[in-house]
Regions:
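Extended beta-strand/beta-hairpin segments
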Residues: 1-40, 50-129
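Alpha-helical metal-binding/catalytic segments enriched in His/Glu/Asp
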Residues: 45-46
Length: 129
């Protein structure tokens, strides 16, 4: 693969193509950028966390939607703004509980600095092609 295109293997046998947008020198837009993948992970994790919470309480919430907008400065992400879309028929108490639960999803906690990220000091050689 050329430029910044990478096949990223994920647990479970999934592969995602990662790249930078075409407006970034060397980027070809062959896949989402790593930052966009983080935003997608935050959206998915938030939705699933809220749905699991609602299911455990027997609430029929149907589908929820989560949008994540990334604010950048010089290509570096400054913030992730999360918008929740919930069914109109929920009570105010249910809505407030789901809002509180949304901030407890594992990806949100990781981004908020509640999870340790360790870069190993071990470097391995790539196998010969």
């Amino acid at each position: 693969m050329g430029g910044y295109v990478h096949d990223v293997e994920i647990e479970g046998g999934h592969t995602i193509v990662v790249d930078e947008p075409a407006f970034v020198e060397g980027g070809t837009d062959a896949g989402p950028s790593p930052t966009r993948l983080v935003a997608a992970g935050l959206a998915g994790c938030t939705a699933v966390t809220m749905e699991m919470y609602a299911a455990r309480r027997g609430w029929d919430v149907g589908a929820v939607e989560v949008d994540v907008d990334v604010e950048y400065e010089d290509f570096a992400p400054l913030s992730f703004a999360v918008t929740l879309r919930l069914p109109a028929g929920l009570s105010e108490e249910q809505r407030q509980r789901l809002l509180a639960v949304a901030a407890k999803c594992p990806v949100h906690r990781l981004l908020a600095g509640e999870t340790e990220v360790v870069i190993s000091d071990r470097i391995e050689d790539l196998p010969d092609a």
